[in-house]
Regions:
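Primarily recognizes the serine-hydrolase "nucleophile elbow" in alpha/beta-hydrolase
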Residues: 153-226
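Structural motif
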Residues: 56-57, 205
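N-terminal cap/lid segment of alpha/beta-hydrolase-fold proteins
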Residues: 1-53
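Glycine-rich His-Gly loop
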Residues: 60-65, 186, 211, 236-237
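The feature captures the conserved acid-bearing segment of alpha/beta-hydrolase catalytic domains
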Residues: 205-265
C-alpha cells in the first residue's frame, strides 16, 4: 500500500496519506480524455487501542456541491458557523477506534466520465440552487444538466470504488468487513447514499450530513429489503431548500418500506454546522452532532457484527 504516514496528534491516530484506490476518467467530452488517480487518506486508531477481529471502519466523502472541496478540507463559512471538515471527523473517530478513510472523488469541473449505470432517474430534476451559487463563486459559466448529471454519477462510481477497495484490503488494514460504515457531508453524503442504495455497494450503515436522495431515487432505489443498511440523517432547520424538503421525505419513505432511519433536524443552523452543534434537547438522546454519529455507529456496527 503506497502512501505517506504521519502521526496526526502526538500519540493519537496515524494518518497514511495519498493512497491510490482507483483510476477514473476525466475530460470525458473533450478530444483528449484521460485517466486520473483517485486517492484517500487513512486514519488509523492509536496504537494504545486494540480490536479483536478487526476494527470497524468509516469511509467519508467531502462536500462542495460536486465542484470543490477536498479530502483534506471542505470547510465553508457563510452567514454563520462553519462546518467541521470530514478529515476532522476521520481523526476524531479514529481516536475512538475506527479505521477512517477520507476519500477523493471526481468533480464536475473535471468533466468526469459518468460510467454506464445511471443512478439518477431524471437528471433534469436535480436541484441546483447551491450548485449555481458555487459556480458563480468559482467564476464558472452556468452548467448544463448533462454536466451536473455526469458529476453526480461519477461521484457515485468513485465512492463505490472506494468501498470496494477498503473491502478488498480489509485484512491488510485490520478492518472488520462486516462493520464498514460510509457517509459524508452534503455532496459527499449524497454520493454515499447513491453508492449504497443505487449501486448496491455493501455497507453496514450510512451517515448523511445534510445530504439527501431525490424523491425519484428514493422510490426506485430504497426498498427496505434485507441487506439495506440503516441511515443516520442530519440536516439544519435552515438548511438548503431542497435538503429541508428531501431529508424528511427520506424519513417518511424509509418508515413506509421498513428501512431503519435515525433522523435529527438540527435547530437554528443552516447547511454548515460544526460537530459540536447542539441537537434538540432530549431526555435520553445525543447532545450534539458528533454524539449522534457516535451513538449511531456504536449501535449499528455492533449489531452488524452480532
Amino acid at each position: 500500500m503506497d502512501g505517506q504516514s504521519s502521526r496526526a496528534n502526538g500519540a493519537g491516530c496515524k494518518v497514511t496519506r495519498d493512497v491510490e484506490y482507483s483510476r477514473a476518467g476525466v475530460r470525458f467530452t473533450s478530444d483528449d480524455p484521460r485517466q486520473r488517480p483517485l486517492r484517500l487518506d487513512i486514519y488509523h486508531p492509536p496504537v494504545t487501542l486494540r480490536a479483536a477481529g478487526g476494527w470497524p471502519a468509516l469511509i467519508l466523502a467531502f462536500g462542495g456541491a460536486f465542484h470543490r472541496g477536498s479530502r483534506e478540507d471542505d470547510t465553508v463559512q457563510e452567514d454563520g458557523p462553519k462546518n467541521t471538515p470530514v478529515a476532522e471527523y476521520c481523526r476524531r473517530f479514529a481516536e475512538r477506534g475506527y479505521v477512517c478513510f477520507s476519500i477523493d472523488y471526481r468533480l464536475i469541473p473535471e468533466d468526469p466520465d459518468p460510467g454506464t449505470i445511471p443512478v439518477l432517474v431524471n437528471p433534469d430534476n436535480v436541484p441546483r440552487s447551491r450548485l449555481d451559487v458555487v459556480r458563480r463563486q468559482m467564476n464558472l459559466p452556468p452548467a448544463t444538466s448533462e454536466m451536473v448529471a455526469n458529476g453526480i454519477e461519477a461521484a457515485a462510481v468513485d465512492f463505490t470504488a472506494a468501498i470496494g477497495w477498503v473491502r478488498a484490503n480489509a485484512v491488510r488494514l485490520a478492518v472488520d468487513p462486516s462493520r464498514i460504515a460510509v457517509g459524508g457531508f452534503s455532496a459527499g453524503g449524497r454520493s454515499a447514499m447513491h453508492a449504497v442504495f443505487a449501486r448496491q455497494a455493501e455497507a453496514a450503515a450510512v451517515v448523511c450530513l445534510s445530504g439527501y436522495l431525490g424523491l425519484d431515487e428514493l422510490k426506485r432505489h430504497v426498498s427496505g429489503l434485507p441487506g439495506e443498511p440503516p441511515v443516520l440523517a442530519l440536516w439544519g432547520e435552515n438548511d438548503l431548500d431542497y435538503v429541508r424538503e428531501q431529508a424528511p421525505a427520506l424519513v417518511e419513505h424509509a418508515g413506509a418500506v421498513g428501512l431503519p432511519v435515525t433522523a435529527h433536524r438540527i435547530p437554528g443552523v443552516g447547511h454548515f454546522y460544526p460537530a459540536s452543534t447542539a441537537l434538540a434537547p432530549s431526555a435520553d438522546g445525543p447532545a450534539t452532532v458528533e454524539h449522534a454519529i457516535e451513538a449511531f455507529l456504536a449501535s449499528t456496527l455492533q449489531r452488524a457484527r452480532a
